[in-house]
Amino acid sequence: MSETSSKHFGSIRDDYAFFLQHSTEAEADLRAYAPHLHGLAMEDESYRMLDFGCGDGGFTAKFLVQSQWLPERLWLVIVEPDATYRRQAVDRLQAFTPHPVQAWPALPPHLKACFELILANHVLYYAHDLKGTLSGILHALATPGLFLAAMAGRTNALAQFSRQCFDILGKPFPFMTAEDVEMALASLGEDYGAEKVHYELIFPDAEEHRLSMGRFLMGSDFDAVPRRAILAGFEPYSNAGEIAMQVVHKHFIVRRHMPWQGRHSAASPPRPRQH
């Protein structure tokens, strides 16, 4: 993720908050990530974590609560291009470690084997150079190490809504999808796993709520889409005074293995640094 990601959240923070409030996406992601974390960090080791595209740190905080890692063992770095979100994330996440949380607007180039865990939760949609971004992330992944990412695919109900709106505008769909991640990982020669994650989006059916969700999905292109098209896009999901959508996306898992002797000890945990 760079400072010029293809979607800017400054004008849609309230709409994004509305989505988070009315969806079970975060809970579903946390449940699905949990089994992959077993054995990642042992009690006498340090663990260096990068959250790539952390937003305001809300999901990261839930992730760290679930992990139950010892604070003194955690070294945390976040990448977030939005300055407001970045400040909020540092304030929220500092409570999870006595070590200063490092915050970057973009991933520095040429990082190598800096992190035992890298999380990219629903952020790779906005990467201008997806293959280059993934290459940089995976170069930063240590051995042993774990990379976890969440991405919606082309059949995702929200992605289909957005695609229909861009079709109306005569514009190509500007965001990456799970299918693009699969192709990028394959072209990089990465051995990865993938699994489906299901969640619900349910909110009271009111015009203002349909418009809010449309604004979240379309970002700066929202005003160009006819209002009636935004409203009509949610009509198939309207029932008994609610909009109810069953949504599915994918998790991608890259795991690096090596013998115990290759792990860093907790006595002198190396801080991520730029090379």
Give, region by region, the residue ranges found by the protein language model.
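Short alpha-helix
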Residues: 173-189
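A short glycine-rich, Lys/Arg-flanked "PGG" loop and its adjoining helix->strand segment in the class I
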Residues: 131-146
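Short helix-loop-beta connector
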Residues: 42-48
